[in-house]
Amino acid sequence: MKNIYHSDIYKFQEPVKSYWEDTTKENFNLSKLTKDISSEVVVIGGGYTGLLCAINLIENYNLDVILLEAGKVGWGASSRNGGFCSFPPIKISYKKLQKIYGKDETKKFFKNSVEGSNYTKDIISNYNIDCDVTGDCNFILAHHPNKFQQIKEQAEVYKNEFGIEANIYSKEEFDKIGHTGTEQFGALSYKPGF
């Protein structure tokens, strides 16, 4: 095995296009680094994290910043996501988080997740980013009748322990506002998110 990732990830000269790249036009030009240059800070990587790091260093610290990207800006994971802004960004439950890290650290984690979601919305607004923000919350569906009680409990924890705005919808209520399929048995909505 030569590489641990699919060979497409190493094709910087001919990156595989994502849905987002195929449905929008590029509105900036990139130049190759062909000579020695200097700056106070060099940020390596032009994904979301690298771009926001560069912006913050320039705007908040007035630093001279150069951003280097081996491929195209936004190429990789940043342009290959579902486009949702939701939290928490993990698959394990809040109960398991509390068991592993304790209640205080879990509260901090959720607080940071809420702040991150709000920060993302602020970035979109402050820079007039045309990204078709839709909605103001996220939903967790009960995919089986016995899961409805779990999401009801989760809503109470979100509200009472983490201070997160959360609402519960019965199957019939959720039918009226969003999803009439037979595979849902109620839902939890929480804010912020989009």
What are these model-predicted stretches?
Residues 2-16, 22-23, 91-98, 122, ...:
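Flavin (FAD/FMN) cofactor-binding and adjacent substrate-gating region
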Residues 45-49, 70:
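Glycine-rich Rossmann-fold phosphate-binding loop(s) that bind the pyrophosphate
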Residues 34, 74-78, 177-180:
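Short glycine-biased active-site loop of nucleotidyltransferases that positions the nucleotide triphosphate
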Residues 80-112:
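Glycine-rich active-site loop/strand segments that organize a redox cofactor
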Residues 108-122, 153:
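A non-catalytic, amphipathic alpha-helix used as a structural packing/dimerization or gating element
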Residues 58-80:
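Glycine-rich FAD pyrophosphate-binding loop
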Residues 52-56:
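Short amphipathic alpha-helical face segments that pack within enzyme cores
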Residues 1-41, 59-63:
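Extreme N-terminal leader/targeting segments of oxidoreductases
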